[in-house]
Every structure is written in structure tokens, then in C-alpha cells.
Amino acid sequence: MKIFIFLLLFIPNLGLSASMNHIGEKGEPSEVDRVIKIEMFDNYFEPNEINIKKDETIKFLVHNYGSLVHEFNIGTKKMHLKHQPEMMEMIENEILLGDKIDYEKMKEIAKTDHSMAHSHSNSVLLEPNKSGEIIWKFNTEI
């Protein structure tokens, strides 16, 4: 199975479901095998290729050097495509405003639509010059 790790402006991302088991699960800080720094820019991210071994737990340290909100997440192509409408809804509801996130609107909408909270363990949504991290245990080699 091919696995994708995407940097995104606003689309696509992933829809969380049981299918997350296809690529792994949230990792434990005490089990991190390796740390990978991810630098996000407006049209690309570095490094542009990552090799991961089966059962490896990776801590991704992610920083947004771009001028827009960007998202880094781990998922299959199908998962990313499934999440596109949610990301568009965030734009339409003025939660994502180009270079910032309206966290108050995000919290309000998340009361009725939990996917809008963007608190998934395989994803970080970052404003410009902000950082985040993901710890992920992969169950397949990529």
C-alpha cells in the first residue's frame, strides 16, 4: 500500500476512521526511534522524501515558514481525498483565513461537527511561523 505524507495549503487532509489502522497509530513519546524536522513553505516542504521502516515510531517536528496556514498530516491518498470537503468547509465558514486560524469559530463549529476541531493525532494545522509535532508509529514501511 502506498502511504502519503502531505503538506497542504488547505486541501486535502484526512478523514479519521478505522482506516487509520492502515498506516499506524499515535505513537508514545517514550518509544520514539527517530526525530524528523519538517519545514513547510508555501508551495513545498523539506525534506521532500522520507523513508520509514515498519514499526518505527517517528517524532515529526513541524514548522510553518510560509506566509499562509498549512497543514502537515499522515494518511493514505483515499483519506486525504475524503477530507477535502471538511477543509473547504473551514474556508467557507471563515475558520481558515489565509494567514490565520479563527480558533473561536473552530471551537464553536466543532461542538456540532467534531471533525472541525482539527485535533487529530496524525495532523498539525499551523499558522505562519508556528510549530507543532506529531508522534506516529507506522505499521508499514514507506
Predicted regions and their residues:
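Sec-dependent N-terminal signal peptides
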Residues: I3-N13
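Short edge-strand/loop segments of extracellular domains
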Residues: T76-K82
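N-terminal edge beta-strand
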Residues: K26-I58
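Beta-strand signatures of extracellular beta-sandwich domains
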Residues: E71-G75
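Extracellular/luminal beta-rich ligand-recognition
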Residues: P85-Y103
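Generic structural signal for beta-strand residues in well-ordered domains
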Residues: F10, P29-E31, Y65
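Extracellular/periplasmic metallocenter environments
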Residues: A18-G24, M40, Y44, K59, ...
